[in-house]
């Protein structure tokens, strides 16, 4: 779905040409009848112990919401890459805002925002690494068209370096729990309120740990690249009296505005949000 389609098209091309992933395995790409089918396939594959990802935006993301609750409740290491786009209301629009991802804030997914092309490359890795170690599924989102279709030169982290960052124990645990007809189990059954509440609250331990896990991976990416990613990056005067908070492609324009205002003697700053959920 526009404007996320190019991501899936690139993966399709890589898969067709036999490009392998970090584990030296060919990537299987499946095209479904709709976004509802796509996220259902992701759910099923993750239940079998496969690491999965998909790409979507806007109305496509809205169709996925019922299964997003399932994925987060079952603590599946899944990443959605979202080129954030307006959700159609009185009319349709293919252009960017955050109305689609904002509609998913209560799904239990962690939400990581990139402001530019280089950040997309780096923080996509952070999302995939963090979901394996942290057990919480991720939405990695960035602005549709403004960022998703921007052409920039970037510096990528070598694959052999990324592979070293994978938590092998957490990955083994996930794969070991995959459904297997040789060892049948039953999951996601109906429970009464007493057990439902207890089991739901039990997952909070992973949400409490997640910001630290994301921060640790950001620091490791910083070490490899020389860049400076934090959960929240501050830019501007140390003694700022006026501070703007934002995320996404607005960052560059706001930073230029902060520079201009500070040169005029004002004390201003900007807080860029990367990890929006859990907040």
Predicted regions and their residues:
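Thiamine diphosphate
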Residues: 1-103, 108, 125, 145
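Short, solvent-exposed amphipathic alpha-helical segments in soluble enzyme
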Residues: 11-15, 69-72, 128-130, 155-158, ...
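Conformationally flexible catalytic loops at phosphate/diphosphate-handling active centers
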Residues: 23, 27, 138-233
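Short beta->alpha junction loops
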Residues: 29-33, 271-278
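Short helix/loop capping segments that flank catalytic or ligand/cofactor-binding pockets
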Residues: 64, 90, 149-151, 253-255
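A general structural motif
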Residues: 91-94, 213-229, 246-254, 273-279
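Conserved thiamine diphosphate
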Residues: 94-144, 168-169
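Redox- and metal-dependent alpha/beta enzyme cores, enriched for Fe-S-associated oxidoreductases
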Residues: 231-234, 238-267, 279
């Amino acid at each position: 779905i526009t404007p996320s389609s190019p991501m899936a098209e690139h993966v399709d091309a890589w898969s067709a040409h036999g490009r392998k992933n970090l584990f030296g395995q060919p990537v299987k790409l499946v095209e479904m009848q709709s976004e509802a089918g796509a996220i259902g396939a992701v759910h099923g594959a993750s239940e079998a112990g496969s690491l999965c990802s998909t790409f979507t935006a806007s109305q496509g993301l809205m169709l996925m919401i019922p299964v997003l609750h399932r994925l987060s409740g079952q603590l599946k290491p899944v990443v959605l890459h979202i080129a954030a786009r307006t959700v159609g209301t009185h009319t349709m629009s293919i252009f960017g805002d955050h109305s689609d991802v904002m509609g998913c804030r209560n799904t239990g997914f962690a939400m990581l925002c990139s402001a530019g092309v280089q950040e997309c490359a780096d923080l996509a890795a952070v999302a995939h690494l963090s979901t394996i170690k942290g057990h919480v599924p991720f939405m990695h989102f960035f602005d549709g068209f403004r960022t998703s279709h921007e052409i920039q030169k970037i510096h990528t982290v070598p694959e052999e370096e990324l592979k070293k960052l994978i938590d092998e124990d957490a990955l083994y645990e996930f794969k070991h729990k995959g459904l297997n007809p040789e060892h049948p189990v039953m999951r996601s059954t109906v429970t009464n309120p007493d057990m439902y509440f207890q089991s739901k609250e039990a997952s909070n331990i992973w949400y409490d740990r997640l910001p630290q896990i994301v921060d640790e991976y950001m620091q490791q990416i910083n070490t490899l690249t020389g860049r400076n990613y934090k959960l929240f990056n501050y830019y501007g005067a140390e003694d700022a009296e006026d501070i703007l908070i934002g995320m996404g492609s607005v960052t560059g324009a706001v930073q230029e505005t902060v520079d201009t205002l500070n040169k005029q003697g004002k004390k201003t700053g900007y807080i860029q949000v990367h990890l929006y959920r859990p907040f």
